[in-house]
Amino acid sequence: MPSETIGVIADRYATALFELADSSGSLDQVAGDLKTLQAMLRESADLRRVVDSPVLSRNDQGKAISAVAKAAGFSELTNKFLGLAAQNRRLHTLSGVIASYLGRLAARRGEKSATVASAVALSPAQQDALTTALKAAFGGNVAVDVKVDPSLLGGLVVQVGSRMVDSSLKTKLQHLKLAMKGVG
């Protein structure tokens, strides 16, 4: 399935979930569930295989995702949503659904979303300092999502909307390599 189609499907599911969560007053609870699920998907190759598998039956995927949701203590709305996604064979769109839902919530709150990649895990103090600096630079609320990417070797890559600042050691070394090739 082309990525554009998956994006459209993910947006539709995210819109439906957002509207249901809004009408039931559980926007934040569902957002918390989705952030937890996002972290679980990032950390567990087994869970990613279950979600992405075209071989597993709807029933097996439904049972697996239901067990995960129950163990994580997700809300009833999130549990029902995940069950519906499994029955409709749409679990493979979960990453897009989560991103779209969280984007809608941030837009509703007037927040900007920042994605930060770091070579090592940032301490809480470093995350607070980074959030403060981003708030000062972009004005207003900035929701920061920090990911660890050891391939960066050092430094940070910060993306807010369409703006990106890459101060990673990996990029600096690539620029140096290109500059050295030009000398000759």
From Swiss-Prot:
Membrane topology, as annotated: Peripheral membrane protein
Molecular function terms, GO-annotated: proton-transporting ATP synthase activity, rotational mechanism
Localization terms from the record: Cell inner membrane
SUPFAM superfamilies tied to this protein: N-terminal domain of the delta subunit of the F1F0-ATP synthase
Keywords: ATP synthesis, Cell inner membrane, Cell membrane, CF(1), Hydrogen ion transport, Ion transport, Membrane, Transport
Similarity comment text for this entry: Belongs to the ATPase delta chain family.
Function comment: F(1)F(0) ATP synthase produces ATP from ADP in the presence of a proton or sodium gradient. F-type ATPases consist of two structural domains, F(1) containing the extramembraneous catalytic core and F(0) containing the membrane proton channel, linked together by a central stalk and a peripheral stalk. During catalysis, ATP synthesis in the catalytic domain of F(1) is coupled via a rotary mechanism of the central stalk subunits to proton translocation. This protein is part of the stalk that links CF(0) to CF(1). It either transmits conformational changes from CF(0) to CF(1) or is implicated in proton conduction.
Matches recorded under PANTHER family: ATP SYNTHASE DELTA CHAIN
Protein name (Swiss-Prot/TrEMBL): ATP synthase subunit delta
Organism placement in taxonomy: Bacteria, Pseudomonadati, Pseudomonadota, Alphaproteobacteria, Rhodospirillales
Gene that encodes the chain: atpH
